[in-house]
Amino acid sequence: MQKYTSEARQLLALAIPVILAQVAQTAMGFVDTVMAGGYSATDMAAVAIGTSIWLPAILFGHGLLLALTPVIAQLNGSGRRERIAHQVRQGFWLAGFVSVLVMIVLWNAGYIIRSMHNIDPALADKAVGYLRALLWGAPGYLFFQVARNQCEGLAKTKPGMVMGFLGLLVNIPVNYIFIYGHFGMPELGGIGCGVATAAVYWVMFIAMLSYIKHARSMRDIRNEKGFGKPDSVVMKRLIQLGLPIALALFFEVTLFAVVALLVSPLGIVDVAGHQIALNFSSLMFVLPMSLAAAVTIRVGYRLGQGSTLDAQTAARTGLGVGICMAVVTAIFTVTLRKHIALLYNDNPEVVALAAQLMLLAAVYQISDSIQIIGSGILRGYKDTRSIFFITFTAYWVLGLPSGYILALTDLVVDRMGPAGFWMGFIIGLTSAAVLMMLRMRYLQRQPSAIILQRAAR
């Protein structure tokens, strides 16, 4: 029991700064929305449309680079720290290549925006302008993620938290300058949010790079030999590990976007109730997601040390802590669901629907916690392909079709409306949780030599 208590302490010490960093990131999005809304409703809508295209594109790159964390954690655990600098250099090369692809996609996103049904031309122009300003921040964001993943792989999650809050502090005044046109800058409205956010990502990257250059704990892994050329072998391995994570993230983000589109014809009340419940549940999701990042670090580190039993302890502890957190957040959601809904909207019909959907959200919080922490465990074992197949099967083969049938058809029961899609979420996330646990058990039952050989690749 003592080893589990000790492991839980170490996990929480890693997870809490990640949670706070995520809070800062969420707050940046909130600040952008509020400040753009203060300028005009059209500008706020433009930021919302632009963000809905930016997120899938940038999260694809973000997911690809997540491969660095278990690689660095494993090298750190095995005492091969001299190899970390080379892995990080290749991470920067990969981030550079992906940045170019993301920027090309975002530059041409106007075709997607202008093809939207009945979109106002002025709104479309502002959304395109916002994206074309924001895309210059893509390299800064992805370079920052490489530096952050280096720190997190070395079990240092506090720098990411500090840089997150630094970004938030810089974002507010820079938004003010570019949205409203102060200090000789042009008045750009919502487009100014894109300029400000792009600048903030570069500030966060430069600050993180400065920390890495001067931190005593990283003195032995600093790159003293210049940047070097791309290493095709290392980059191929990073892509093999990272691409399934990137695709899994992409499928998850697009699933919720597709559901939002399917809900939109059902009416204003249904859309508002669905959006409130989804927004609140995404805030609760920050807890298990951050814990999953910590579990990846601990499992990778323990495997690097050559101890499959300690890796199992880290995995089980992460699941135990995650389930406890999910039970607490589920009770909180059920108890206060009406009060929470009232914070968003005071329309009685919207509040009633949001409260009903939050009951379903409380049910899936436990499954969601298990599946995302399970994903973190599998990342630690460098078994990322299974994450992609499980995510795709659970969300797109089981969750979305069953949600569609329950919500919009009479095949099984009378049309349930938005609640049907939420039943689909429960089916999809529970399926993902079960499949993640089965895969984890399969991996852990393999001989130690095979587990360690895979982890060392």
UniProtKB/Swiss-Prot annotation:
Disulfide bonds: none annotated. InterPro entries: MATE_fam (IPR002528), MATE_MdtK (IPR050222), MdtK-like (IPR048279), Multidrug-R_MdtK (IPR022913). Pfam families: MatE. It is a multi-pass membrane protein. One of its GO terms (molecular function) is xenobiotic transmembrane transporter activity. The chain crosses the membrane at residues 11-31, 53-73, 93-113, 127-147, 160-180, 188-208, 243-263, 276-296, 314-334, 350-370, 387-407, 418-438. Belongs to the multi antimicrobial extrusion (MATE) (TC 2.A.66.1) family. MdtK subfamily. This is Multidrug resistance protein MdtK. It comes from Salmonella choleraesuis (strain SC-B67). The lineage of its organism: Bacteria, Pseudomonadati, Pseudomonadota, Gammaproteobacteria, Enterobacterales.
